[in-house]
């Protein structure tokens, strides 16, 4: 796939911004199990999945992994660039759930685009709201529903999705 097809705001960038993005974007093939972003230890940038699957999770105080959301083809992960956003104060780890190909817009490039391009700023706000909604749904499930109710819901989803 071409960069133009994967970057959601590509058509709304100026020619100069598009050229800088083409020159600075990183393309990586990552193996299953690879940690792509390790919380506050990294400030990776905006990650876009070209192929494969990623998982965003956090660790509880007792070391349990809590999956916040998954990312599939053409999904983007903003929390790997959370260091450029004020008031984002939680640890998110991004792991490849299968062999994957990802694009990364480096933090410095993405931060510049947020400040100079209204479409990129709007995309960022929309993505942040969407991911916040995902995280809140997970928290609601964990805090307000028993394990047996969550397991029953998961099993019914699996049953419905089978051919």
Language-model segments: residues:
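Cyclic nucleotide-binding regulatory module and flanking cytosolic helices
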Residues: 1-32, 81-85
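Glycine- and acidic-residue-biased ligand/ion/polar-headgroup-sensing regions
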Residues: 33, 44, 48-57, 73-74
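Short loop/turn microsegments at loop-to-beta-strand junctions
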Residues: 25, 43-44
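Short phosphate-coordinating micro-motif centered on Lys-Gly-acidic
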Residues: 36-41
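Short alpha-helix-to-loop micro-motif enriched in aromatics/charged/Gly
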Residues: 61-68
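Cyclic-nucleotide recognition modules
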Residues: 68-126
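Polybasic "coupling" helices that flank or enter modular domains
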Residues: 115-161
């Amino acid at each position: 796939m071409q960069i133009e097809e994967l970057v959601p705001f590509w058509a709304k960038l100026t020619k100069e911004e598009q050229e800088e993005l083409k020159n600075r974007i990183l393309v990586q093939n990552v193996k299953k199990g690879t940690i792509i972003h390790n919380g506050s230890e990294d400030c990776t940038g905006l990650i876009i999945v070209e192929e494969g699957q990623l998982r965003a999770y956090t660790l509880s105080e007792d070391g349990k992994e809590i999956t916040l959301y998954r990312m599939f083809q053409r999904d983007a992960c903003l929390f790997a660039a959370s260091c450029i956003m004020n008031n984002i104060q939680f640890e998110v780890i991004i792991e490849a759930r299968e062999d994957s190909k990802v694009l990364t817009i480096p933090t410095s490039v993405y931060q510049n685009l947020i400040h100079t391009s209204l479409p990129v700023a709007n995309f960022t706000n929309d993505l942040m709201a969407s991911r916040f909604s995902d995280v809140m749904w997970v928290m609601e499930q964990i805090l307000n529903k028993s394990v047996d109710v969550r397991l029953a819901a998961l099993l019914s989803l699996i049953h419905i999705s089978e051919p």
